[in-house]
């Protein structure tokens, strides 16, 4: 009987050790900036304008909605919860706007949490999406040629285009 109790004791200790190892590996895999994402509320919805230079392509990743407006001046506005807006990354490089959601633990949060990027652009040549998110054109976009690529993505797409050639 005493041997059985010792086995239970050591079994419980192993379960505790494995649990602590699992928790510590979960916490250490988070980037320093996003260490507490899993327990942080999204906060009040806020909008933030970001610097924009001319671009003709958009590449976007997970859990971000895109709204496109016709504009002669390029613009980028991000709307999200105040605690999470810094995790929505917008980078411009060589005429391409890259949009990423670096917030972690999105599976913990409500599906009502939305991250939206509104862009103003004169002529858009292509959109590539690599995750979840809806794409909406608020105005008709004109271009000679337009390409839309969807790589393992889901969401709705409502494009208003006036172009000679399109690749969807």
PLM feature segments, named:
Residues 17-23:
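Sec-dependent N-terminal signal peptides
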Residues 1-8:
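Extracellular low-complexity Ser/Thr/Asn/Gly-rich intrinsically disordered segments
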Residues 9, 13-17, 30-83, 102-120, ...:
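Short acidic/polar N-terminal linker immediately downstream of export determinants
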Residues 96-102:
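Short carbohydrate-recognition loop motifs
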Residues 48, 56-68, 116-168:
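Extended, compositionally simple hydrophobic/Ser/Thr-rich segments
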């Amino acid at each position: 009987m005493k041997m059985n109790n010792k086995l239970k004791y050591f079994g419980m200790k192993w379960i505790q050790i494995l649990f602590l190892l699992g928790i510590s590996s979960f916490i250490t895999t988070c980037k320093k900036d996003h260490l507490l994402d899993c327990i942080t509320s999204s906060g009040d919805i806020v909008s933030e304008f970001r610097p924009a230079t001319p671009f003709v392509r958009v590449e976007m990743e997970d859990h971000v909605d895109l709204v496109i407006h016709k504009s002669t001046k390029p613009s980028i506005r991000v709307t999200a919860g105040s605690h999470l807006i810094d995790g929505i990354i917008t980078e411009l490089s060589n005429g391409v706007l890259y949009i990423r959601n670096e917030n972690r633990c999105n599976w913990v949060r409500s599906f009502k949490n939305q991250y939206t990027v509104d862009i103003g652009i004169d002529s858009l040549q292509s959109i590539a999406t690599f995750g979840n998110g809806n794409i909406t054109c608020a105005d008709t976009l004109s271009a000679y040629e337009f390409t839309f690529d969807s790589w393992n993505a889901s969401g709705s797409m409502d494009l208003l285009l006036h172009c000679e050639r399109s690749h969807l």
